[in-house]
Amino acid sequence: MKPICKFLLAPALFCLGGVAPIFAQMSPLLPSEKAPLSDRYVAYQIEAKYDAKNHSLDAAETLTWTNYTGQPQDHLPFHLYLNAFQPKSTFTREGYIGGNRDVKIGAKWEDRKFGEDVIKSFEVVGMGDLTGNLRFIHPDDDNAEDKTVLEVQLPRPVAPNEKITFKILFHDQFPEVVARSGYKRDFLLAGQWFPKIGVWWKNAWNCHQYHATTEFFADFGTFDVKVTVPSHYNVGATGVQVAENTNADGTKTVEYKAEDVHDFAWTTDPSTKIVEDTVTISSGTVKIRLIMQPGHMASAPRYMDALKGTMKKFDEWIGPYPYSQITVVDPPHGGGPAGGMEYPTFITADTTWWMWDGLKVPEVVVEHEFGHQYWYGMVATNEFEEAWLDEGINQYTECKIMDALYGRDVDFLNTRVATAGERGVDHAVYLGLADLDPITRYGWKFIDSNSYSGITYSKTALMLLTLEHIIGEQKVREAQHVYFERYRFKHPTGDDFMNTVNEVAGQNLDWYWNQAVRGTQILDYRILSASSDRADWADKNAPKREKKGETEYISSVVVHRKGDFIMPVTLEAKFDDGETVRDSWDGVDRWHRYTWQKKAKLVSAEIDPDHAIWLDHDVFNNSWLHDGDGHATGKIAGYWMVATQWFAQFLSWLA
């Protein structure tokens, strides 16, 4: 049987007679007790019944949308993300070509259960049943088999500021867990599971297909979601639980509400354990809810401590977390693709039963995913087109917070055998890249998934760490704070971020942005040559001096700009009388020669002695050490270069 046939023979849907009355049962959203934080252009009400045996659900969605575009609209696009998990989708094609491991590992496509989001009926109140007006569109490529973007043609235009209400019946078939959504045994992570309207952005509809390397973009609004599951299943979701009712058929219905968010995810599993605590920050007391696998309970205190520390640092450095709850989901063994993901007020973590204390994976993942609550969740940039504004800025913030919580250089790995810091890992990943793509490239247009992750995450973090060298750590932190306060709930762009940094720094940094963000220039300064010879050897007329301390030496160091990235650099030279000399160079020319004549011999020279230029693509050519003939230093450096390149390639593969 061909895959598509196997897919079409998925378990039957609930009869329409059992689903249609859901609309009548829905109650309006309760009025909020606080002023809206966002524009709230969308209001979703969804009732879903989950079939745990077949990992599918049937749902009724009521969506009220306000036409904020400033012009009449007669066609509207919707995301159907679950349709990415099919053999001929753009996601799958890019996954095989670009090396996305979530698609390739494990069972072959022929042996998997696919994902699908099927529209059963599509109505607009006052316009009638528009199911016949639906068509799939492909704004990013020519793949007619891709069904991740749906367009509805309206019988009349929606006027500016007019509200319309959609009533949609749909059926989801979840895939075996892959790329942020799906099931593993009895565990389910329901992410990107409902029809979601696109965003009007930059005077056009922004509703990209689901790509192998891209995440998401949506408008802010409110959610009222009721999920019916077997009565012995635990449920966690975006927002807060407001009701739970037991049904006569052995199920229960759990209701969650969320405001000023742009997405909604949930999870269910019969075997999980719930751990709860609170943390107090400037905005008040926040409830922390851990949904743990029984075999991972030893990691619960690590998750909790890391999350509390992270929330306090974000509150101190960036701004307040305005929601009353954060939920952390611990995926089961074999459910790795569900781990390390963020949704509003809801994140997934990662650990194993054997996770030892010295390896900070649980802490790193929780810190990183909570950080997304700010850059992805509240600032809410376009992750299809400018993923670095979330992933990269968040990776930088992760480095800083992990430093503060656990200590620099040991905040990723800290054992007797070896240590590793967050920034060192990022640099190792970056070393393994060819730097073929600018940070600003659209997510699906990178040469491959390794380049996407290495550039978007690691290079952006290193770019901001290097920025500290230029304007100072406090200015970078202040710029992050100003950017967050100014643009939360606003969907800003990369230019907004860079202009904010320019403003806070009090200088035009376009010379840096053009190279580090918009360009692909390699930053690499090296010591081309170094020498320290007696002055009387160079000048035959110089008087001979035999007594110690009287012999003069002419020392020379030539620094070479090997890469195309122009950056001011500092050279530190040390002499055998204990003197240390530092000198700066603007780095513009291809090379620069430093020369000293003094009664001391040059013993070492180093570019960037403070190790502050994290974008340096080759740190092994930054130093010179006098050791007689120089062969020993070169040999040792060669061994380290080979080892580091291997490690960099390994980390790049993991990223």
Where are the language model's segments positioned?
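Hydrophobic alpha-helical and helix-loop surface patches within well-folded domains
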Residues: Y41, L80, Y256, R289-V557, ...
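N-terminal, polar/Ser/Thr-rich
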Residues: F23-D58, K184, D510-W511, Q515
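Bacterial N-terminal signal peptides
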Residues: L8-P21
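Extended, low-hydrophobicity, Ser/Thr/Pro/Gly-biased non-transmembrane segments
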Residues: G99-M127, D142-T148, Q153, T165-T272, ...
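Short, aromatic- and glycine-rich surface loops/edge beta-strands on solvent-exposed regions
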Residues: T165-I168, K601-D616
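Short acidic/polar inter-strand loop motif in beta-rich domains
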Residues: F85, D172-V178, P609-N621
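Beta-strand-rich binding/interaction modules
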Residues: G236-A237, L509-D510, L523-P609
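Ligand-binding face of N-terminal immunoglobulin V-set domains in extracellular IgSF glycoproteins
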Residues: S56-A84, K88-S89, G99-D102
